[in-house]
Structure formats: structure tokens, C-alpha cells
Design a protein with these regions (language model features):
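Phosphate/pyrophosphate-binding active-site segments
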Residues: 1, 136, 204, 300-398, ...
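Active-site diphosphate/adenylate-binding microenvironment
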Residues: 7-10, 15-17, 25-28, 33-37, ...
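Active-site nucleophile and cofactor-binding loops and adjacent substrate-binding regions
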Residues: 25-27, 46-56, 71-78, 133-134, ...
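Thiamine diphosphate
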Residues: 99, 108-114, 263, 270, ...
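Generic enzyme active-site microenvironment
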Residues: 158, 305, 395, 448-449
């Protein structure tokens, strides 16, 4: 008999599935796993200071590398601390496998110390959850977990292993290393004949259209079809609108790029969608922040929806044609059916909206030197320029700065813009940034966070320092929960209820962690400070104290249509 433990089997299964890095925090019910991990040096473990940080780090690692991220936690509070991170990954289609310890099998259901039914808790925010009842099931469960996490629309999968199963011995010779295949967990694809018929119909609609628009989401990045998208747009002279999570699917410098649509999208993106006679949604969810009021979205357009996930079709928006298939294969079939086109009349109309675009995006005139108190958008524009210059990965937290960065970012490679889009989880950026940097050690990574979101996960600075991760961290400090304050200004008569916040002296905080830190509060400090920060070898912290009551525009209010944008000139006076 060649005996091994369940914990050792779990470590070997992770290696076999291609895992290289684990983000986690140990505890009692997961101790056998951590003991086995000691004998598996090929599995790098990153000790996060909070389990939510571990989940976000696994998410950032997965987005930056295209590989499945792995996070680890103990039972009870350790496992429940993962939930926000798993929900963020679930909403944005990020492949993550979460490994949790559970109390020993006899204690399940008895309210044992640190017992939580974590499989039950995470049902709404995972693709599937496994409670491993037998040690011999471990190899198959991990095989299936990784397959499910990465297949179809990616997402998180949970593997919960009781402590006694981790410690149990099993004869290796009796094990099957192949994964169990549960047919009920796999969505049956459309037949080739159905897909071909759908593609023919899409081609007909596109070739007859006078005012088509491509609405692009994260599915383009996940399917690796940015090249096909660019070819389609160039060949058929198509305007391209990119969602928050699809910004890096199409070059911002391409003349056909109209930017981000939706609540804080560009005028030309929103007006183009509203005036279109055909909207082709490629790997996009048509969520409320993108389309505005559903019954008034693109009122004269036929809607085509390409998505690998059948449950995404008509979840929020009608679809005249739905193509449920891998986007790469769908576009491969569509491209030969689409001839070259000249859409000059449509483009002339779009150029009129271009001329009305936000004047604050105009570059400064030659010789211009910015002076005076620092503006938030001005600060973020400078950071965005540094990100583009170095082909860096941009990781944004949630709030006003998230929208400004999305508006200002230049060209980015697919997988280079990371943010919590669907869930909007504050505290995401710092741990996701460290995960991205570990996954892409040869690329610079910039974290952009507000003072509110930064304080939700700043304990991960200790992880950054311990692991020697050269993050560039820019904190936009306006002394408010900025996006909430903006809504209070517009809709609640400037009654700023519990949105003004204080924070630590970040120079002192950086010193406490041994991180070089700069404080900026004037425009003339920007360029020199960012240049210094960019060349530091280790992590750096840039504290940007900006004007307090700056707002993000344009803005489409909740319940409004995309062409009912409020611009800076139309803001309600205080």
C-alpha cells in the first residue's frame, strides 16, 4: 500500500490542474492542507491579510493571466470572508477555484466551532460547490472544479473539504485521477446547423444596416477575439463601443473607437447606440449601467446578441437574433459573409457628436503648465498617461475615480484593465493588483483607488511588502465617498449624510510599511512625482489630495435613456 493523505492529494491535484500560485490565509479546519503544502514548493502561497483580499487577488491573477486563480481559507469566518470576492468574480465571469476547510464530517450540522455551510452560502455566487465526502473523490472533484471554472462563461467554483477528509489516508493505487463528468453541470451547445442559420441572419442584417454599432464586452477578451473584432470593424467600417469590462478589447486610439457607453459613458457612444438601426452585442451582458432604461434603449435598432452563456440572452434586453456559441467560432463564421463597406454618412453623423464631446479631454496646448490645487480628473488623466506610456496593467477600485480612469485610459492590451464591474466591490483594487502583478511579473501594475475603497483593504500593503511586489498605488483622496456624495448632491439636496470620511496620514502609513510615499496636492507636482514613482524598483504609494466636490460627467440618471445625459454644463447648482 502506498498511502497518502487527502490534503496531499489536494495539493497534487492543484499542481496537475496547472495551479502555480495560491492566495490564502490558514486556520484550524484547513491545517492539514497547509501542512501538506509545506512539501509542495512548486505551489507558491501568498499569505493575504484577509480572506476577501485572497479572493480578489485570485481574481486579479486570473484576469491578468487568463489562468484560473486559486484562493484558500479555513472554515466558518474564513470561508464567509471569501464571499464578496467570489461574488465579484461571478458577476464578471472570472475563473477562480476556492478551496475551503470544513469541520470534520461528524461535526457537520451540529453548530460546531467555526462551522458554516459554505457550499449553501455561496450557491448564488458560484457556478458550483462541492462538499468532498470521501478522500478518494478529491482528484476527480478538483479536475471537475477547474473544468467548470474555465468553461462556458467562466466563474468561481468552491471545493469544501472537511478536516478529517484532508487528514484521511488512502491507497494511491486505488485512485482514479480522471475527473467526474456531471452532464447536468454542462450546458448543451447549439447545433452547428442552428449556429450557421443564426450567423446567416446576422450577416443579412449587417449588410442591410445603415447605422450599425458594435457593443463589445468582456466576452471578447475571454474568447481571445480582439483581433477578429478589429478586422470586422475595419472591414465593415463599424463604430465600436466598449463596456467598462471590455475597454481593453479594442484599441482606444482606433478611429472607430467611440469609448464607453452607459451611465458615465461618452456622448458619442451613447448617442450612437440610441440612433443605431442595428446593435451587435459581442460578449456583453446588456446590463443596466450600459443600456440605461431598457424599454428606451436603441429604440429603432434590431438587437443581435452573441454570448457563450444561454442564460445571458434576454436577461435584460430583447434579442432579435441570439447566437449562443463560442465567440471566436461565431466571428470566424461571420467574417467571410461580411463585405467591405463604406459608412461615410453614418460616420459624418457620429463626428457631429464627436465635436460636442467633453472639452476637458482636450490635451493641454504646447508650453502649458498646470498650476494650482489638484483636480481629481486631472490627477487621473496623468496617471492614465503613465499607464499607457509603460503598457502597464491598470487596476481600478470602485467609485468616481473608476469612471474617470475608464474615460481617460488609452490603448491597452486585452487583460490590462481590471476592475470590479458587475458587483462594484470597494476594496477590490489593491489585492487584485497584487494578484495581477504576481501573475505578470514582467509588467508594471498601477492600482488606482479612492480614499474610501483603499481603507477597505489597506492591510494588504503588508502582503505587498512581504512578497516584494512592485505595485504603483495611487490613492485619490477627496475626503468623501465620492460617488455617493455626487448622488447626494444631485438627488438629495446636498445633504451629505455619512459620506465625509477621514483617513490616516498616508505618508506616515507608507513609512510604517517601509513603502516610499509621495503626497501631491497641486497640479505642478504631478509629472515629476509620477515619473519618480514609475522608476522605483519596489512598491510605491502616491497620495493625491484633490479638490473635494468634483463630479463625474456625463451622467445618465437611473431610469433615464442613454440620450438623456446630464453634462457638466447642466449640473444642478448647489
Amino acid at each position: 500500500m502506498v498511502a497518502t493523505t487527502g490534503a496531499d492529494l489536494a495539493c497534487r491535484a492543484l499542481s496537475r490542474e496547472g495551479a502555480q500560485v495560491l492566495f490564502g490565509h490558514p486556520g484550524g479546519a484547513i491545517l492539514p492542507f497547509y501542512d501538506a503544502l509545506y512539501n509542495h514548493p512548486s505551489l507558491r502561497h501568498v499569505l493575504c491579510r484577509h480572506e476577501q483580499g485572497a479572493a480578489h487577488a485570485a481574481d486579479g491573477y486570473a484576469r491578468a493571466t487568463g489562468r484560473t486563480g486559486v484562493c484558500v481559507a479555513t472554515s466558518g469566518p474564513g470561508a464567509t470572508n471569501l464571499v464578496t470576492g467570489l461574488a465579484a468574480a461571478f458577476m464578471d465571469g472570472v475563473p477562480v477555484v476556492a478551496v475551503t476547510g470544513q469541520v470534520a464530517r461528524p461535526g457537520i450540522g451540529t453548530f460546531a466551532f467555526q462551522e458554516t455551510d459554505i457550499v449553501g452560502v455561496t450557491i448564488p455566487v458560484t457556478k458550483h460547490g462541492f462538499l468532498v465526502q470521501e478522500v478518494s473523490d478529491i482528484p476527480g472533484v478538483f479536475s471537475e472544479a477547474f473544468r467548470l471554472a474555465a468553461s462556458g462563461r467562466p466563474g468561481p467554483v468552491l471545493v469544501d473539504i472537511p478536516k478529517d477528509v484532508q487528514a484521511a489516508l488512502v491507497d494511491e493505487k486505488t485512485l482514479s485521477l480522471s475527473g467526474r463528468k456531471n452532464p447536468e453541470l454542462v450546458e448543451p451547445p447549439e447545433s452547428t446547423q442552428e449556429i450557421e442559420a443564426d450567423i446567416q441572419q446576422v450577416a443579412k442584417l449587417l449588410n442591410e444596416s445603415q447605422r450599425p454599432v458594435l457593443l463589445v464586452g468582456r466576452g471578447v477578451i475571454l474568447s481571445g477575439t480582439s483581433g477578429k473584432l478589429s478586422y470586422l470593424a475595419e472591414r465593415n467600417d463599424l463604430p465600436v463601443v466598449t463596456s467598462l469590462l471590455g475597454l481593453d478589447a479594442f484599441p482606444a486610439s482606433d478611429p472607430r473607437a467611440l469609448g464607453m457607453p452607459g451611465m458615465h459613458g461618452t456622448e458619442r457612444a451613447n448617442y450612437s447606440l440610441q440612433d443605431a438601426d442595428l446593435v451587435l452585442g459581442l460578449g456583453v451582458r446588456f446590463d443596466d449601467r450600459v443600456i440605461g432604461r431598457p424599454d428606451r434603449f436603441a429604440p429603432n435598432a434590431r438587437i443581435v446578441h452573441f454570448d457563450v452563456d444561454a442564460t445571458a440572452i434576454e436577461r435584460t434586453m430583447r434579442a432579435d437574433v441570439a447566437v449562443v456559441a463560442d465567440l471566436s467560432e461565431s466571428l470566424k463564421m461571420l467574417l467571410p459573409l461580411v463585405p467591405k463597406a463604406d459608412r461615410s454618412a453614418w460616420w459624418e453623423r457620429i463626428r457631429e457628436w464627436n465635436r460636442e464631446a467633453d472639452p476637458t479631454k482636450e490635451p493641454p496646448r504646447p508650453g502649458y503648465r498646470r498650476m494650482g490645487p489638484l483636480g481629481a480628473r486631472e490627477a487621473i488623466r496623468s496617471v492614465a498617461r503613465k499607464i499607457s506610456e509603460s503598457n502597464a496593467i491598470a487596476v481600478s477600485d470602485v467609485g468616481q475615480h473608476q469612471m474617470w480612469l475608464a474615460q481617460e485610459l488609452g490603448d491597452a492590451l486585452p487583460g490590462s484593465h481590471l476592475t470590479s464591474g458587475g458587483l462594484g466591490a470597494m476594496g477590490y483594487a489593491l489585492p487584485a493588483g497584487l494578484g495581477a502583478a504576481i501573475g505578470q511579473p514582467d509588467r508594471s501594475v498601477w492600482v488606482v483607488a479612492g480614499d474610501g475603497g483603499f481603507q477597505m483593504s489597506l492591510q494588504e500593503l503588508a502582503t505587498v511588502v512581504q512578497e516584494g511586489i512592485p505595485l504603483r498605488i495611487a490613492v485619490i483622496d477627496n475626503g468623501y465617498l465620492g460617488m455617493v456624495r455626487q448622488w447626494q448632491e444631485r438627488f438629495y439636496g446636498r445633504r451629505y449624510s455619512e459620506t465625509q470620511i477621514s483617513g490616516p496620514d498616508l505618508v506616515a502609513l507608507g513609512k510604517a510599511y517601509g513603502i516610499p510615499t509621495w503626497r501631491i496636492d497641486r497640479s505642478e507636482q504631478l509629472d515629476s512625482t509620477l515619473s519618480l514613482a514609475a522608476i522605483e524598483e519596489g512598491p510605491v504609494l502616491i497620495w493625491m489630495q484633490v479638490r473635494q466636490e468634483e463630479n463625474v460627467y456625463p451622467m445618465v440618471e437611473s431610469g433615464a435613456a442613454l440620450d438623456e445625459m446630464v453634462t457638466e454644463s447642466e449640473r444642478v447648482p448647489g
